[in-house]
Amino acid sequence: MSLLSQFYSNKELHVTQAIRSKEDFGDMDVIVKGSSKRVEVENFLTSSNYPFVKNGDVTSFLYKSFQIDLIFTNEDHYEYSCNYFDWNDLGNLVGRISKQLGFKHGHDGLHYVLRNDDRIIKEFLLTTSYLDVIHLLGLDKLKFKKGFDSYEDLFEFVLSSPYFNPEIFKLENLNNINRVRDRKRKTYNLFLKYIEDKTYNKLDGFQRKLTYKEKEEFVFSKFPKIRQEVETLKFKVELDNQIKERINGR
């Protein structure tokens, strides 16, 4: 973007890609590498009479009838973020499949979150290679790199995962936060409509909700190096709980 060229090189800005048949380009998402210049950019927008709104890591403003959303990302996660936000809501759809397998998939990488009830014990960063995640889910890396011409292309790509389970996408099966958010998303709702009458031939066992243990074993099967640390942390948590129970029982 020429407007930001005084602050960033082309390698530090990425205009997210949308399906090529998309007709409505009323907005533009731009991934920004690093946030060290954010205040400087916002001061420039103010002095140039471009009012902006801040929401977390996003700064939004109007430019030549476009809404521009600047998404400021950690430099270490820049490449992953570019892929995550490309192709409409694909990152969110991929995240649904990842979650049912025991992973946490976001714009900053693929993680495994060890919990004790609702308390997070540790979050393990597994990979910051988006193509590795695509491969892990049984999706075609070359197809992803080529991109998508239509919603149908995009949706069929998601359906091609052997781990695809339509139940995990239904709004009634989401928690309240995700349900409220995804109900507003055009691509997500089009996807729900698209899969209504589809039939599937997928891996046995992945057409149901996996248990915590099954998810854990799946994660370990793909990332065996974290198993020992996870087991050690679980043992320490259990030991702490036993000690607390004895103290409270006195």
Tell where the protein language model's regions lie, with residue ranges.
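Compact mixed alphabeta submodule
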Residues: 1-3, 95-96
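Terminal (often C-terminal) interaction modules
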Residues: 218-250
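Active-site nucleotide-donor binding segment shared across nucleotidyl transfer reactions
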Residues: 2-40
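Metal-dependent nucleotidyltransferase catalytic core
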Residues: 1, 32-70
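Short amphipathic beta-strand/extended segments with alternating polar/hydrophobic composition
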Residues: 69-72, 230
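Catalytic cores of NTP-dependent nucleotidyl/adenyl transfer enzymes across multiple folds
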Residues: 62-64, 71-221
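Intrinsically disordered, low-complexity eukaryotic regions enriched in glycine, serine
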Residues: 3-4, 8, 34, 53-58, ...
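Short secondary-structure junctions
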Residues: 7-16, 42-59, 103-110
